[in-house]
Amino acid sequence: IPLYRSMKKTSAMFQDIVSSGPFSSVAPKAQMNIGRAWINKARGFKISQNERHKNYHMAVEAFKKAADKYHDRPGVASEGLFAAGAAYQQQSLDAEYDQGVIHKAIDSFSDYIALYPNKERVSGARERIQAMKVEQARGNLKIARYYENRGKWAAANIYYNEVKDLAPGTEYAETALQKIAELQPRLDVEKESGAQPK
């Protein structure tokens, strides 16, 4: 999107196009370009993490609007849904402890797969979902270790179980299975003693 140096001005220009002729032949592309401008702004230098998250949010909203408003144009609708998932995925790279963003990305890609099963980007969407699940597993493994180091065996066990379910067959799942086996005797002792689980 080469027009203005300011992506905010660029997105405003594309918004003017969409507002002037919402169902014109150029409006769908302009709506998608609004999202792309916000993505470019999020990738810019000298902005805070909070500002970057707001920019990704604006991009997602623009892409979703394209998918919803132009749902009768399959190319635009599918591209908007895929782009929304990709924007959520980019945002999730900044938000290590915010698993909600990853869930939204996975949901967007899952919707894309369900609604457009014959599109060529379906395999890419599946790969992205798998990569994000592995990333979720890595994050949950860190949380499980945190609880284990503080003697909160039941909480650690919950997160280790999530790890093995999210990314079966990975090194994270193997580690989680090993830790679950190590924690089981401690959990059994707590259960037998009637103590409140830690």
PLM features: residue spans?
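Acidic, polar-rich low-complexity tracts and alpha-helical solenoid repeat scaffolds
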Residues: 1-198
